[in-house]
Amino acid sequence: CRAKGDTGKAKTGFYVIYEHRNEDRTFYAGAFGSWREGEKGSFHKLKPVGGRMTAEDREVIKARVEAAKKKEAAKQAARHARAGRRAAGIWKTLPERGRSAYLERKQVTALGLRFGRKPGTALVPMRNLHDHIVGMQILFDEPDADGLSKRYWPPGLQKEGAFHLIGPHPEPGEAVLLCEGYATGASLHMATGLCVVVAYDAGNLLPVGKAMRERYPGRQFVFCADDDWKTTNVKGEPWNPGQEKAVNAARVVGGSWVWPVFDGERDDKWTD
């Protein structure tokens, strides 16, 4: 089902309600959650209603909740697999040369990208640790009907831990730069010549950082954060998710962090 934050055809939510009967009572219990919060998802149990439960009732309900969780995880894995096959098949047919107004506006080149059948559309591959394509990020020539200049495709893709590599294979001891968006990654590589890892958004920096630590042991990791100084949380309070997520990822995987510095009413990305 659709969950908070879903756009387009995305449906990352799930729920299950079931009935349990003992000799004299009927209980209703269940769970709900969203896969948007990662591969393990967010899983919330609903408090059973219908009266006081025995220890046996609680064990039965616990077993059913765990079974429901495993069932949903299997469904999600199947959706990821279908999306990956679909994306990989389309990727093979896309041309390596083309034009993108998005890239021109950002003043970056196409590094490992391909171009869509719709004029002006560029696509960034999303790969997992095994280098399998799990999906793509579409960079539109102009914002779409929802006002978005970027969108993930196809529905059901596994975004957590997915990345795009730019530049040479890093030798032991060399620096690896990790960032959010493609334009930022391309700008960093064009400026430094270093290996850059695009994680697509701030929330994916930690999963991608863990994957890169496994792939590239002995390298220096530098998390290049967006400076989201204009952002506020749901309460309207200042919140800088770009810096927060980058610092947390660096501390967890063992790395350093940095963000762009501007004067006055500043910009917020390395591309700027």
Predicted regions and their residues:
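Phosphate-handling catalytic cores of nucleic-acid transaction enzymes
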Residues: 110-115, 134, 222
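TOPRIM fold recognition
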Residues: 171-174, 186-272
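Non-catalytic accessory segments of DNA primases and related replication-initiation nucleases
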Residues: 1-102, 228-230, 235
